[in-house]
Amino acid sequence: MSFDLIIKNGTVILENEARVIDIAVQGGKIAAIGENLGEAKNVLDATGLIVSPGMVDAHTHISEPGRTHWEGYETGTRAAAKGGITTMIEMPLNQLPATVDRETIELKFDAAKGKLTIDAAQLGGLVSYNLDRLHELDEVGVVGFKCFVATCGDRGIDNDFRDVNDWQFYKGAQKLGEMDQTVLVHCENALICDELGEEAKREGRVTAHDYVASRPVFTEVEAIRRVLYLAKAAGCRLHVCHISSPEGVEEVTRARQEGQDVTCESCPHYFVLDTDQFEEIGTLAKCSPPIRDQENQKGMWEKLFNGEIDCLVSDHSPCPPEMKAGNIMQAWGGIAGLQNCMDVMFDEAVQKRGMSLPMFGKLMATNAADIFGLKHKGRIAPGKDADLVFIQPDSSYVLKNEDLEYRHKVSPYVGRTIGARITKTILRGDVIYDIEHGFPVPPKGQFILKHQQ
């Protein structure tokens, strides 16, 4: 048999092992895995390279429409492809209007036409003003619903995202449970974080350490405990976003051991940056929950290797440079990290700390695909989409601003020596990024709808 593509001689990350083996692709799908697979129209030699499932980034902010000057589909998805991401799950906020009903999600689909370099699934918003319209987003095909119990949104803009109070969360989660949906939550205690932040500003405490102190670990842990209890009472599956502390992870682990249907994610910046580095880098490393100290980071690595964190995500949330001006307490909180999830974590987790390749594949791709029901994504296996990434191990480079594909070429990782490189990204059998040739095909990404897979 002749295939469209055969990838030869790479060390392939399979679900429970990694070995040198060939992959055959036909019609955008993985057709076979093995040796002596036959002929193909195209052959790629992956000798000396790691062949990983394309990353499924379950937490990405693309601010189009309405705030395309923050980040747009064209720049954001090119950066994703360059970083080895083949599928993103897009958050319902930062764009205007927020994605909270049928009309607003259709605006997203229209805005993205002809611009997606990678595939994308959508989350709907659970906000204070759309409890009677959640079903519209479920019917369209979102793969989950995001909400905040921390303060969010610009109160001066009517159609911006809004946080929910406990009553709104409980009622919304009840409705989502009936739809067999997942609720995703940003967990920080809104009132305590807000008051601690205002107190620090009044007293002139505006350093990175002051910012971290204004969002202490207990504010994350308390919020996680609360939403775990309320989601359980409401009968809804829960996913806790961007956990930053081992104590927060422990709450999820305890609930899981008690039988609750709950998963969680974290981000590379909580594993590779600490508060002292945050102080040096400045506002580009500001996010919430914040980047904490080295002892906290050590605990996060332990939780990751213990299997208590389900997936790693970028939480890519950029903004124009002027919004990062001023002191750390004033600046916008959000990190541009889309392009450097895979290479940074391969270097730090696999090369420096000995993580197994199958575990890396699960954290970067498989688990997120399973959590959000992306049936054709996340695995190198026959029948799955041929979404693949070539990683060159032990290949150091220093990240420069001009390497970035973002609308604004800034990142807290600029200047960092990264010990691995993404050399090729393949989406449904086509090379969409190549380290030598850039982006060789026009954007071919598609939206993935829950009910149409």
From Swiss-Prot:
Its EC number is 3.5.2.5. GO terms for molecular function: allantoinase activity; cobalt ion binding; zinc ion binding. Zn(2+) 1 binds at residues 59, 61, 146, 315. Gene3D superfamilies: Metal-dependent hydrolases. Keywords: Hydrolase, Metal-binding, Purine metabolism, Zinc. It holds the Pfam family Amidohydro_1. Binds 2 Zn(2+) ions per subunit. Carboxylation allows a single lysine to coordinate two zinc ions. SUPFAM superfamilies: Composite domain of metallo-dependent hydrolases, Metallo-dependent hydrolases. It comes from the Bacteria. One of its GO terms (biological process) is allantoin catabolic process. It catalyses: (S)-allantoin + H2O = allantoate + H(+). The modification N6-carboxylysine is found at residue 146. One of its GO terms (cellular component) is cytoplasm. Zn(2+) 2 binds at residues 146, 186, 242. Pathway: Nitrogen metabolism; (S)-allantoin degradation; allantoate from (S)-allantoin: step 1/1. Its cofactor is Zn(2+). Homotetramer. Belongs to the metallo-dependent hydrolases superfamily. Allantoinase family. NCBIfam families: allantoinase, PRK08044.1. Catalyzes the conversion of allantoin (5-ureidohydantoin) to allantoic acid by hydrolytic cleavage of the five-member hydantoin ring. This is Allantoinase. It comes from Salmonella typhimurium (strain LT2 / SGSC1412 / ATCC 700720). The lineage of its organism: Bacteria, Pseudomonadati, Pseudomonadota, Gammaproteobacteria, Enterobacterales. The gene is allB.
